[in-house]
Amino acid sequence: TTKSTIDVNDLTFTTRWTDGDKMGIMYEYDNGEGYNTQATYSNGTFSSKLPEATGTRFYYAYYPYQAADNATSHYVDIPFGAERVQNGNDFNSSYDIMCAEALDFENAEQGKTDDGKDISFIMVRQTALLYFHFTSPEVDEPLTKATLSVEGDPIAADT
């Protein structure tokens, strides 16, 4: 399953879900009791173990999974500092933040829709992927580090 593909001048950058990727699923009952659980990707699908329950509940999905000790609402902190490490096309997916619109069901089994189907999330990327191609005839050694800055405006938050 493709997460994203960028094609610039026939140079393709593709990220894909890989076995072991961890998505967070937060679910909350109508009484405000909330849980944060991990769903792990394997063989083309994410799976998670949710407790047996029926009734009204709300689901929120996000990536990458973050352990949260006290998930009582639909918020989770995802560390996101200003420095990023990228090694060629070896994408660092810990900065590929995605989330899905909340889903709510009135009287469904845990992990199911009201009509008994498995819940399914449409993930939306919260960051941008940028492609840089550096060329210079004066450089006779490999470029190992580059710093991007924008005059007068920050390009990333401190955390």
Name what the model sees in each region:
Residues D96-I97, T147-T159:
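Contiguous ligand/interfacial binding patches
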